[in-house]
Amino acid sequence: MKLIVSRSQISGCVHAPPSKSHTHRAFLLASLAKGESVVLSPLLGEDTLATLSAVKALGANVCEGDDRITIQGGNLHAPLPKGTVINCKNSGTSIRMLAGIASRLDGTTEFTGDASLCSRPMKPLLDALSELGAGVTSDNGCAPFTITGPVSGGDVHIRGDVSSQFISGLLISAPLGKADTRIHLTTPLTSKPYVDMTISAMKKHGVSVETIEDGYLVRSGQVYSSEDVQVGGDYSSAAFLFAAAALAGEIAVSGLDPADPQGDQVVISILETFGAGVVRDGENVTIRKAALKAADIDLANAPDLFPIIAVLASQAKGTSRLYGAAHLRFKESDRIMSTVLFLRSMGADISETEDGCIVTGPANLSGANVTTFGDHRIMMASAVAGLIADSTTTVDDAGCCAVSYPGFVKDMQKLGADMREE
């Protein structure tokens, strides 16, 4: 299904969608905790549903209710049924975190996914699990692969600059072992706020993580406690709403906790740096259109913001440099390439660098036929760009936003955007 976008002005109020990152962690930790946990207001997108399906397959009892998921955990320690297969669809978070958990369980688990997921790098994590003693089989360092456990713990070495999800997977699974687990990072950690989010979520369930000189220590003997978790709004998804307002109107977004550890909360300060009108009042953020000025933005710790920040930069006076996000080349698409491709097709003055892009603005954008490569963030960023284009923009895959923000098009229409699916 295609998305057709025409030039529009937007205004109004909308509630931020639930956080994808928090929902993944809530489902996983509830499944590992002994007792009943309730996850309130979760995001039920394609990625988080892949995680929920996986924890069911691994032994958790799940009951779906109105705006809540009840999980009876603690059964994942039982021997796994022979031939257990986990299909993580397109979810990198699911496969990377669940692989760590599978290494601690008694039995063999096979992991697979769609074509895109099966092309994404897993080798650093698979090598780390092998170092811990897991049986690992993989033809090329990607899915499909199998993990045979259980491993007890010990010292493990892993790169920190490929995916923070590798580190989160090792951390979440560590308390299941009989020995302490020390995670040694062999390169600097990128997207550290996502690891901090994992550590914060673990703490809420009664498990502490210690920082050591080159990584993290999780002591054995800790047990996850059951907890009810309220999932807050998602700054990563709200960034598309913010940018739309900064370019084409004024909107208020509610449900965004200023104390939330999400790294993508930095989008608010980025908008201020570009010169957008920003007003924060508790959990409400109002963004209004303003003349934007160029800025240099380090996205090492907030790489998911890259596509939409590039759209903003295309409308800022002067030359902006977005950098620090080389690991974006291993996302659902090569996100640096796909971002530059769609913006250039719309008339932006933009060029790739190894770890980001250089953009000179403001550009008069024209409508174009956009290829998303099945990437939800490219779909939403290009749709926002279409709001200020001189002619109609056609986005090739309207449905891929269901991965992280299923209600994106409806929310934009509510705000007055001329968008339709066909």
Curated annotation (Swiss-Prot):
The active site is at D304 (proton acceptor). It catalyses: 3-phosphoshikimate + phosphoenolpyruvate = 5-O-(1-carboxyvinyl)-3-phosphoshikimate + phosphate. One of its GO terms (cellular component) is cytoplasm. It is found in: Cytoplasm. Pathway: Metabolic intermediate biosynthesis; chorismate biosynthesis. 3-phosphoshikimate binds at K20, S21, R25, S163, S164, Q165, S191, D304, K331. It is an enzyme of class 2 (transferase). Its main location: cytoplasm. It comes from the Archaea. SUPFAM superfamilies: EPT/RTPC-like. Disulfide bonds: none annotated. Keywords: Amino-acid biosynthesis, Aromatic amino acid biosynthesis, Cytoplasm, Transferase. Monomer. Catalyzes the transfer of the enolpyruvyl moiety of phosphoenolpyruvate (PEP) to the 5-hydroxyl of shikimate-3-phosphate (S3P) to produce enolpyruvyl shikimate-3-phosphate and inorganic phosphate. This is 3-phosphoshikimate 1-carboxyvinyltransferase.
